[in-house]
Amino acid sequence: MKSIGIFVVALWLTHFCDGGQLGARIYSSGSESSVLLFDQYINKYAFTNGDVKIIYEGKSIFEILSETYVTDFNIFDRAISQDNLDMFQIVQFPLAGQAIVMTYNLPELVNSSYRLVIDRETLGKIWYGAISKWNDTAIQNLNPTVGHLLPDTDIILGYSDDYIMTISGLIKMALSSFSPEFDTELKYANNTFNGMNPTKNGRGHNIGETSTVRLEWLKKTSYGLTYINYADVYNNGTDSTVPMNMYNKAGYFVEPNLVSVQAAMSDFKIFYANNNSTIDIYDAPGNKSWPLAYVNYLGCSSAFGPMADCTRTIQMTNFIAWIYTNDAASESAIELQFYPLDKTLQKVAIDNLYNIKCNNIAVLSQQYLIGFGAPISVMSLWPNSWTTVASTARYYSAPSSQALELQETYGADFGITVTGVPNTYFNKMPDLGVMPLAAFTIVPAYNIPAINGTNGTLILDYEIITDIYLGIINNWNDSRIRALNGIEINRKLPNVSITVIYQAVSSDYNFMFTDFMSKKSPKFAKKIGSTYFPILTLPNNSMIITTDIYDVGNQLISNSNSFAFWPYFGITMLSRQPTVQAASIRTEKGNIISSNSTTLEKAINNFISKGGSIEDAPYIMGENDESWPLSALMTMIYRQSTIHYAAKAAAVADFAYWTQSNPTAINIATIQGMYVASNNPTLKSRNLNLLKNFVVDGEPISSIANCIYQGTICSDMGTCNNNSCLCNSYRKGIYCENIVSSSGESIGIILAIVIPVSFVICCIIIVLVIALIVSIRLHQRVEDEWEVDFHELDFMESLGSGGSGEVFKAMWKGTEVAVKKLVNSNITKDAERNFKQEIHRMTSLRHPNVVLFMAASTRPPNMCIVMEFMSLGSLYDLLGNELVTEIPPVLRIRIAYQAAKGMHFLHSSDIVHRDLKSLNLLLDSKWNVKVSDFGLTKIKDNNKGKSSTKEDSVCSIQWTAPEVLSEKQDIDYILADVYSFGIIMWELMTRLRPYIGLSPAAIAVAVIRDNLRPEIQEEDINLMSSDYVELVNICWHKDTMIRPSFLEIMTKLSTLIGGSGITTGTSTSSSNQSSDYIGPNIITRTKNIHNNDETKNSFGSTTYGSNTISSSSNTESDKILSKLNKKKIPTGEVIIVFTDIISAEQLWHHNPLAMKNATVLYNAVIRETLDKIGGYESFIYKDHNSGEGSFCLVFQEAIDAIDFCSISQKKLLEIDWPEELLDHPAAASEKDINGTMIFAGPRVRMGLHAGTVKIMQDPVTRRYEYSGVTVNIAAKITMMTHGGQVIMSEQVTDKISNNDCSNIKSLGQIEITDTNNYKVNIFELRIEGLIGRFFGGVAFYNYDSVTESTDLDDTYPDSLNFSTNGILYGGIKQENEYLSSAGLCRWIINYDDIQIGKQIGVGSYGIVNMGKWKNINVAVKKFVKQKIDEKQMLEFRAEIAFLSQLRHPHIILMIGACLKRPNICIVTEFMGNGSLRNVIKTTKPEWKLKIKMLYQTALGIGYLHNSDPIIIHRDIKPSNILVDDSMNVKIADFGFARIKEENSVMTRCGTPCWTAPEIIRGEKYTEKVDVFSFGIVMWEVLTCKEPFSGCNFMKVSMDILEGARPQIPSDCPIDFTKLMKQCWHAKPDKRPSMEDVIMGLNDMLGPEKSL
């Protein structure tokens, strides 16, 4: 039986089923004991990789073996033997440890917290029948506390005799190991429990194979005993099912837990290290080991193929790798009492992953480096910062000695030691590489609040330190301490006890400081000595003992007046303010020395120059008074020539070189007070030689090996490019080791002798010309690497506009890219030169969190930058997208971390952003964040102290630091970027727009004057944690010195997402993989979210014919929404329901505001009913806006769809519709002959059809669009339906044939000719209570092919078309032939009908182009922000409808609007002379014309103020006053205040020259703000100058608030001056009305006015 089972497994593993959807579905089965574990794994993995759907089913071993042809991998409780692994090319991986527990049900002990204890021998006797009673003496002796309670009752045993690869077989083997007698009896019984005495005596029962079954049996069986997985008992047990504790093989008492199971695994690690993955770990010999431990194994083929596509194999392998490397996987397993592998075993398992091959190529391409070593803070940041797409590094803290031992067994890819390498290890490992990476100091550290802030630090000497540790000095005010320190510190030293903190655990740092102090003080050597584990004899109230090797730093900062030796980097990482400080030391010669970069560097350089041994130095003692006396080398250890995998060795080499050469890596170490080894020439040379000799199979493995020569890179005379030297012009040779010799002189002599002088001159000229050409060609070649021909770019839709240009989506060489095209008006000679300089700068910037520069066109007028396309758009849009219903806190923090990482890189590269905001943080398809728009900025050193002019001002006021707003001198723009990042973190926390409702000027004034910041509420703190909020507050702090660097921000955010924090004891791992886990209690913010809509119309498509859904869009949004949206979407054969408001066009024309409100009410009823019934709202079409009157709804069950129609039709009668709308016949209330209300409000028709569909998914929101023939037929059925009527197809009624169908009436048959002459029998649903509705059949227009119906009089159109605004079915232009007929309103324009011309301006909306529509010249104002949510779109519809009705000779005619993305815009009449600003600037009009234009302007403003409702312009200025060819003026840019505000963050905002003071103060305002603006316009027209010229944004704002106004010319007429001053009065109530202004200007015009 066993051999048959193994054979079946082998057949499956070698065949490897390729079923399921490509790259989307992995099916597995395995033991029941692993169900809980895999449920957790699968849930967590969905947040790491949403591209793959993993299914796991727990089954019996025989079921597993019988269905191996349909599974992708299996999980076993036992290992497959090595013979079978080799024979059938199987690879298996130890997955997780579990504890089996003997579990009992004793009613007498139910109320007791005591657990019975059993030993191995006694347990064996119970199971072979020598002990049969619960009160047996052996059991009582083991449990004296409750022995008297044990009953004289039979022990009832529950078991399973399944043996193959089950824990029952493992239990038999364990019991045989426990008891020789049991082993003998088991063999007599043919290896079955069934044949042993307990069963023969009626006390043994075969109760089932699985642990869960045995647990259920035990719950019902008093006095029962069986073996169960501890995870099952822990998660599903009751008070009556209690697991036993045990005495293990070594005789020690143990409990089932993480420690005891991992100890058992560790006992067998030597077998795993030798690649033996077939062992069982029961009855382990260790002191802490659980006797009944076992390991789950995952098995799969090691040789897949031949296969056309290895994607599924790759996905499976990535999942296995994730199990071993993700912290969330380990943590969730531990919570359920499954125990992750020992870290060294994880490393072995990961290495085995590289043995999985597909088509003879290793499947796993990413290299996972595992390192162990001393707890060093830099090792929490270096791996995270280095990790690339191809490599991942993880670092775990362990003593240096353990790091060395793991190298011996290949248990780690690299190690870190801080105590050197003893010579004995070189004997064991001749190829051991020892590479110093950095050095650090170990310091006497103190936390004395009383002396914080004083000049200098506390001074101590070695004898004082000794006496502190011996308890001789126990007060900080001791006279000997005072004698060493100055007056200021002496005055503040407190009279309090010294609290000594030390580690009562073996520690590298213990050894270094005790050995050092023993050499400095004989007294210390005698009393304490050199030891890894010091023992102090201080009073308990004078010391704090910690057993955590990382916790000294935490204890120091948590306990005032404390003292300890600790690494310097450990105290710098504790807090922003120097609460814990390093004491200075007075040396034996009386000199005072402090720990700093200089004294550390001198200590290391002195040690190296004197030939100090790098390999075996436990620490470094400074030998002069300029060197810090105690420092240590942080040294990387690795196997120099025997690493098994070349790719892994290469990754180790690259990581090592990166730490020594990369500016980010060096900066990370330097900031933490470390000295990087590459700063020392000897160490740098030594390390390079080590990399040169780093080999696998004798071949150099480092990516720079071929460039290393005598400890240099290319002899320091060139650069290493693709592992070969590119020499400087005057050097040559493989390593640039030779100087280029000059033979020109001798050649010249020969030529002078041989050739006439004239020929020589000609040759020289030719050489010079050739040299010049070559130089030009070389320079051009460098530029050609990134220069692109503008005409190679295939431009697509606009993605948005910024301060310096517009961004387009484009295709370039078959790749989607983003192209930023510079505004032509900005391109001067200086701008062109600066642009090229910045491009050169950008070509060198490469970072995973910075948008990738790809190419550029530098030739005017088509200057542009080509960048990678970020498919998910900006963070600004994502946060405002209402369809992304939830973003988990951990993902928000990770987004912030990635953004900080990108900014840290820019700052490290000497680049400041100066326009950092959520709009400039972009997301790719995997939700990776990248910083954009940093180009075209200045290098920071050239920018400090410089101000931006108002022409350069981009409206990013919300994110701008107060010092930048106030134009202070010597601005640190690095810290200004940090301020902006604080606002972004607030946006991530709240998903709100900062300072919504305030004008830019009001924001700027409040930020500077009132220190205003966006509001943080209690719910924000609850959602994101107080630590996150604290980081926000210090980022946007007014005091720039308090703001952190981006490196500090990264560290804090890394801690919040489960990153390291080694020195403060928060974690021992530096994994770059966050734990993307969303707990069950996600807090949902209920605040209004502005700007919510789909981010893109980019869909992947998959056709589904089953209940299994999987996206092919490959986006990380699956991580979030696939788990947050628990509702299962309808798939397979579904019911499509269309709902549609008929006559919507008429109702919008009748009263736009009322129709807007009615549409909101209608949408709410449909969605509330849908949620109650359980359907799904589909996108109707990609370019169609939601919520316009039509819904496409999808149901899995027909009865649910019919119930929805009935309930919603009734609910629509209960709504309190707007009275103004009920005046229209298409919405009027109607009653039947009995007085029952049967109609009220807009009439809603509904059509239903059933069938299969095509489903496409949006990559951002994960919302699905349903399409196909079934949807089209449902839409056509809806088109023939009257308002208030519900019609369905026969395919729907067939699905409810078993229900009462008395309320369903047949209407006959129709033929739909555009779907292969599809004939449809249709039926009407008669809704109870609405029977009085009479329709007389269906509503046809010219429908044909209608048969077998007396009610169907007309014919049906023979084609299905889509109109641009409504959804048209057929060619007859009648309103109700459309779904969403709201799109047919006369003021809604099809963008394709407009011929777009040249750009003529940039306004508050965005870009303005000239155009032609129906042979009429028009102005097209296209919004920068194209993502408008449903609520805003309805408001926009209502406002455009209202504004299009306005008619006045002095306001611009609103022709209409285009409502479809990506071309949302408004269309107005075109004014030939442009703006008033342009006219007065270029023509200098005469006085009478000036007064005439002002008079007409006032008339236009007055009309707006007298409209109902009143229209306040808020932005009156000459650029918004347009002039026609006859010099008549019209007011433009009125209305759409909300959309203007949303768009303003993407466009230039200029200065508030025309803004009334009440707006700047953020107060409520009236139409008098327009009067104020008009007063400024009067001055501007008067003088033909720009107000407040030369003043920046903040000066203008403050001047207006302080009452400053433009200077009035002395020759200005008195009446004009008086009116102007009245208009711009500071107090609104003192300003005239526009009627008064009109009268005043009318008087100035006199009788000659010509209007």
UniProtKB/Swiss-Prot annotation:
Its membrane topology: Single-pass type I membrane protein
Keyword hit for Transport: no
Signal sequence, renumbered to the chain: 1-19
Transmembrane regions: 749-769
Regions of compositional bias (Low complexity) in chain numbering: 1100-1115
This protein's record includes keyword Oxidoreductase: no
Binding site for ATP: 799-807, 820, 1400-1408, 1421
GO biological process, one term: cyclic nucleotide biosynthetic process
Gene3D superfamilies: Nucleotide cyclase (3.30.70.1230), Periplasmic binding protein-like II (3.40.190.10), Phosphorylase Kinase, domain 1 (3.30.200.20), Transferase(Phosphotransferase) domain 1 (1.10.510.10)
Protein kinase domain residues: 793-1057, 1394-1645
InterPro entries: A/G_cyclase, Kinase-like_dom_sf, Nucleotide_cyclase, Prot_kinase_dom, Protein_kinase_ATP_BS, Ser-Thr/Tyr_kinase_cat_dom, Ser/Thr_kinase_AS, Ser/Thr_Kinases-Pseudokinases
This protein's GO CC annotations: membrane
Keywords, comma-separated and alphabetical: ATP-binding, Glycoprotein, Kinase, Membrane, Nucleotide-binding, Receptor, Repeat, Serine/threonine-protein kinase, Signal, Transferase, Transmembrane, Transmembrane helix
Sequence segments annotated as region (Disordered): 1089-1115
EC number: 2.7.11.1
Locations listed in the record: Membrane
Domain (Guanylate cyclase) ranges: 1135-1278
Residues at the catalytic site: D915, D1515
Gene Ontology MF terms: ATP binding; protein serine kinase activity; protein serine/threonine kinase activity
Glycosylation sites: N111, N135, N190, N236, N275, N276, N287, N452, N455, N477, N495, N540, N596, N722
This protein's name: Putative serine/threonine-protein kinase/receptor R818
Organism: Acanthamoeba polyphaga mimivirus
Organism lineage: Viruses, Varidnaviria, Bamfordvirae, Nucleocytoviricota, Megaviricetes
